[in-house]
Structures are given as C-alpha cells and as structure tokens.
Swiss-Prot record:
Cofactor(s) required for function per UniProt: Mg(2+)
Family, as annotated: Belongs to the small GTPase superfamily. Rab family.
Gene Ontology BP annotations: autophagosome assembly; bone resorption; early endosome to late endosome transport; endocytosis; endosome to lysosome transport; endosome to plasma membrane protein transport; epidermal growth factor catabolic process; establishment of vesicle localization
Effect of residue 8 to A: Abolishes interaction with RILP and reduces its localization to late endosomal/lysosomal compartments
Keyword Heme (UniProt): no
List of residues that carry N-acetylthreonine: 2
Keywords associated with the record: Acetylation, Autophagy, Charcot-Marie-Tooth disease, Cytoplasmic vesicle, Disease variant, Endosome, GTP-binding, Host-virus interaction, Hydrolase, Isopeptide bond, Lipid degradation, Lipid droplet, Lipid metabolism, Lipoprotein, Lysosome, Membrane, Methylation, Mitochondrion, Neurodegeneration, Neuropathy, Nucleotide-binding, Phosphoprotein, Prenylation, Protein transport, Transport, Ubl conjugation
Gene name per UniProt: RAB7A
Name of the protein in question: Ras-related protein Rab-7a
Function: The small GTPases Rab are key regulators of intracellular membrane trafficking, from the formation of transport vesicles to their fusion with membranes. Rabs cycle between an inactive GDP-bound form and an active GTP-bound form that is able to recruit to membranes different sets of downstream effectors directly responsible for vesicle formation, movement, tethering and fusion. In its active state, RAB7A binds to a variety of effector proteins playing a key role in the regulation of endo-lysosomal trafficking.
Length: 207
C-alpha cells in the first residue's frame, strides 16, 4: 500500500483590524479566547492537523494585520495560499464594506492560477453581541454575487460555528491543493512555431 505524502494547506485570514481574525484562529486551534485586544503586527500563523474526508492534512493558518500599512507584505504571505478567509464584524458595517477590497487585494497579490474559482470563505463574526448592524441576508447576497462563497456567522468568544466554518475551509483548501497538484503533474505542452522548429533543427544538425 503506497503512503500518501503529507499535505500542507495554507489558509490566509483577511479583514479589517479588530474583526476577530486572531480570536477565530486561536479559538479553532487552541480552544481559547481572550478579551484583551492586541493588534497583529505583520503576520503570524498557527498550524493544526485535521482529518478531511479520511485524509490527514496540516492546516497552516495565517493571521495577517488589518492595517493598510502592512498590506505591502501581501505578496510574500499570500502566494501559495489554498483558501482565503474574509472576516467582518457584524456590528461594524464598514468592516463588511471593505470585503470587496480585501478580496481584490488578495487576488492581485496571490495571483492564483484560476482566480474565478479560487476558494474563499466569509465569516460574519461577533454574533454574540447585541448591537448587530449587518443583516444575514445582506451578507449572503454579497457572497452569492461573488461566485456563491460559503458564508458562516461566528462567535470566536462563544465558539459558535468556528469548528464548522474551518471544516469547510479545510475541505475547500484541500480541493484547491489537489487541483493544483493535478495541473502540475500534467502541464500544458509547449507549442513551437516554425521559427523555433527551424532553429531546433539547425542546432541538432551534425553537418
């Protein structure tokens, strides 16, 4: 029986400062939540081994700073991503409005092979708070307009839907990784034009 190689899935979490990106990651990986807010500087990541459809994979979850001055770090952190998680705060409408720019920024920086079908997942966080400002239907409509992105409403504090959301993230990331592997195993043939063939023929001539 041949053993499958270990799979590393790179997941990027994006969104404005204070929406709960770090808290969601810590709740999922460490089952912990802290009320003390500490802004992420640059980027940080945690890893977690999970089973996805009977396959053991390692998720490398990158938590990036939401401040604009750190967006220039993007290329190094975004490249090679298998899934991108967009997070907004349901009590802060402005964090929802910026999802478009975060999505566009990721696609520019990461340059995925198939941007139209690259897997995103959207999390509407902080549903444990009472002063909700962004309606579920509004968020669902936005996700539907962007190639039907999966949408979850979460609470990092109360651990609501966090596990379920990351299961979907892992499954979609694994699907993306598998498609990239297949693409790399069967690259498109290189087509030579007449000049290239003539040049190759001349170089191989022994006379």
């Amino acid at each position: 029986m041949t053993s499958r190689k270990k799979v590393l899935l790179k997941v990027i979490i994006l969104g404005d400062s204070g929406v709960g990106k770090t808290s969601l990651m810590n709740q999922y990986v460490n089952k912990k939540f802290s009320n003390q807010y500490k802004a992420t500087i640059g980027a940080d990541f945690l890893t977690k081994e999970v089973m996805v459809d009977d396959r053991l994979v390692t998720m490398q979850i990158w938590d990036t700073a939401g401040q604009e001055r750190f967006q220039s770090l993007g290329v190094a952190f975004y490249r090679g991503a298998d899934c991108c998680v967009l997070v907004f705060d349901v009590t802060a409408p402005n964090t929802f409005k910026t999802l478009d720019s975060w999505r566009d920024e990721f696609l520019i920086q990461a340059s995925p092979r198939d941007p139209e079908n690259f897997p995103f997942v959207v999390l509407g966080n902080k549903i444990d708070l009472e002063n909700r400002q962004v309606a579920t239907k509004r968020a669902q409509a936005w996700c539907y307009s962007k190639n039907n992105i999966p949408y979850f409403e979460t609470s990092a504090k109360e651990a609501i839907n966090v596990e379920q959301a990351f299961q979907t993230i892992a499954r979609n990331a694994l699907k993306q990784e598998t498609e990239v592997e297949l693409y790399n195993e069967f690259p498109e043939p290189i087509k030579l034009d007449k000049n290239d063939r003539a040049k190759a023929s001349a170089e191989s001539c022994s006379c």
